[in-house]
Each structure stands twice: as structure tokens, then as C-alpha cells.
């Protein structure tokens, strides 16, 4: 599975795809990696990273959602962000060669309710592109308190016909991925476009569908250091979880 994720740009509406991670203490996030497919001429413009908390944080709970559920989704609005255009993020790319996936969520493939039949489409089918690993350095680190978050990377492809598609990873997490700490659940990947916002859809449960519906994680890692809390004499233990160690190539779904 691969899901589109891009900032808005000339002739292209915004699409966001997110997967979750947990911090058990105040943490400075200094870098990240993620992997996806580039289509078109694979020329990268802006790279943006957003952090969301879990609904109902940062959300309007009085409105009626236009999706089957908001439980365990990202919030309505982002908690924090960094982007290369603002100079608080820089990045390098590594070309991993051509790759294909059996299913995808492409621009125009995200639909809200009424339900049924929307939003279930079964996905938008197979996709081939240049597999690229992104190494991102946050020149202004994210300083995040203990909480459950979603990581949302977006890549602008300057070719009008091109896009970035974030690759999936197994769910439940398998080695060398980092398991979630006790008391926290590994949530599945979610996505939305600017027409669906502020709502989100589950990539597997809502868009692909089926009985049972598949669930997906995404390929990413985060690097950070614990930050002393005020009046604390020792560093808190850092638990950076999610797909923190998933950096190897695999046969994608």
C-alpha cells in the first residue's frame, strides 16, 4: 500500500497521510526518516513534516463528522510543523530504484460520507515509481511532551503529473520495528485531503474496506533525546515508538 501525501502547490490540492508514535517523556525530536514512491520526473521541491495529536485533542467535538469514525484519528488541526521552505528543516534523498505496490490511495481517491457506499473504494490499484528514502534534519527540533502523536510527512513533486506516495509497513509491528510501550495501542494509518478536512479516514478500514479490512502502518523512524523536566534531577527515559526501526527494504503490499 502507498498513500499520497503532499503540501498544496500550483494546481495540486493538499493531501495528508499519518501514522502514530508515542513519547513517554518530554523529548526533543531532531531527525526523521521516511520512505515512499515518487512518480513523474521525481524532482522534489518542498518537504514538510507535521505533528498531530490524537482526536479529540485540538479538535471541534461539537460538529458532526463526515466520516464513519474519528476515534483514534489525528486531530482536526496540527500540533506543530516544520518545512524546508521556512528553513527549519533540511533533507537528503537516497534513490532505492524502481518499485511497485499492489494498491494505493491516489489524489481524488478520498471520499467522505454519506456512507455507504463512500468512502470505501477498495483503493486505487497498483502503482509504480522511484522508491526514495528521505533523511530529514530538524534545524529547529520538535520539543514534544509525553503523549500519543501522528507523524505526517508531505513531499512536493514539481512535475505537474508527479506525486509522493508514502509506503506502508506491517501492522502489527514486526522486528526490527519498535513495539509500543505497555498501555498504548499501535493505531493504523489515516489519510485526508483538503476537501475532507478536518476529518480523516482509515486507509485500510474505511478506504480499502473488506471483511476483515486490512490495517496499515507506514515506513518511518524518529530520532530524539529526552529533555529534563523542570525540577527534575535526572533525564526521563525515552520511548520513541511507532515504526522507529523500520528502515530496511521490504516487499511492499
Model-derived segments and spans:
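Aromatic- and Gly/Pro-enriched, solvent-exposed loop/edge beta-strand patches characteristic
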Residues: 38-181
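Extended extracellular/luminal ectodomain segments enriched in beta-structured repeat modules
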Residues: 24-33, 44, 146
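Short, surface-exposed beta-strand/loop patches at domain edges
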Residues: 143-148, 154-226
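Short, charged juxtamembrane terminal tails flanking transmembrane helices
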Residues: 250-253
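Short beta-strands within extracellular/lumenal beta-sheet-rich domains
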Residues: 11-23, 134-135
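Boundary/junction segments of secreted and surface-exposed precursor proteins
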Residues: 1-7, 64
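A short, hydrophobic C-terminal helix/tail in secreted or cell-surface proteins
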Residues: 229-247
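A sequence-level detector for low-complexity, Ser/Thr- and acidic-rich stretches
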Residues: 13, 33, 39-41
Amino acid at each position: 500500500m502507498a498513500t499520497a501525501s503532499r503540501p498544496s502547490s500550483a494546481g495540486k490540492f493538499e493531501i495528508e497521510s499519518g501514522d502514530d508514535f508515542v513519547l513517554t517523556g518530554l523529548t526533543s525530536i531532531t531527525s526523521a526518516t521516511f520512505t515512499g514512491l515518487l512518480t513523474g520526473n521525481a524532482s522534489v521541491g518542498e518537504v514538510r513534516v507535521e505533528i498531530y495529536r490524537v482526536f479529540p485533542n485540538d479538535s471541534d467535538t461539537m460538529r458532526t463528522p463526515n466520516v464513519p469514525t474519528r476515534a483514534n484519528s489525528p486531530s482536526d488541526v496540527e500540533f506543530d510543523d516544520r518545512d524546508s521552505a521556512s528553513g527549519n528543516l533540511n533533507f537528503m534523498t537516497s534513490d532505492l530504484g524502481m518499485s511497485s505496490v499492489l494498491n494505493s490511495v491516489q489524489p481524488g481517491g478520498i471520499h467522505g460520507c454519506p456512507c455507504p457506499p463512500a468512502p470505501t473504494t477498495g483503493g486505487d490499484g497498483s502503482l509504480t515509481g522511484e522508491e526514495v528514502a528521505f533523511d530529514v534534519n530538524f534545524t529547529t527540533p520538535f520539543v514534544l511532551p509525553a503523549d500519543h502523536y501522528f507523524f505526517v510527512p508531505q513531499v512536493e513533486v514539481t512535475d505537474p503529473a508527479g506525486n509522493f506516495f508514502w509506503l506502508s509497513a506491517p501492522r502489527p509491528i514486526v522486528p526490527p520495528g519498535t513495539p509500543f510501550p505497555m498501555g498504548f495501542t499501535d493505531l493504523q494509518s489515516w489519510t485526508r485531503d483538503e476537501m475532507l478536512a478536518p476529518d480523516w479516514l482509515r486507509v485500510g478500514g474505511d478506504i480499502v474496506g473488506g471483511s476483515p479490512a486490512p490495517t496499515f502502518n507506514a515506513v518511518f523512524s524518529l530520532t530524539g533525546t529526552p529533555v529534563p523536566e523542570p525540577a527534575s534531577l535526572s533525564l526521563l527515559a525515552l520511548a520513541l515508538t511507532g515504526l522507529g526501526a523500520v528502515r530496511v527494504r521490504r516487499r511492499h503490499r
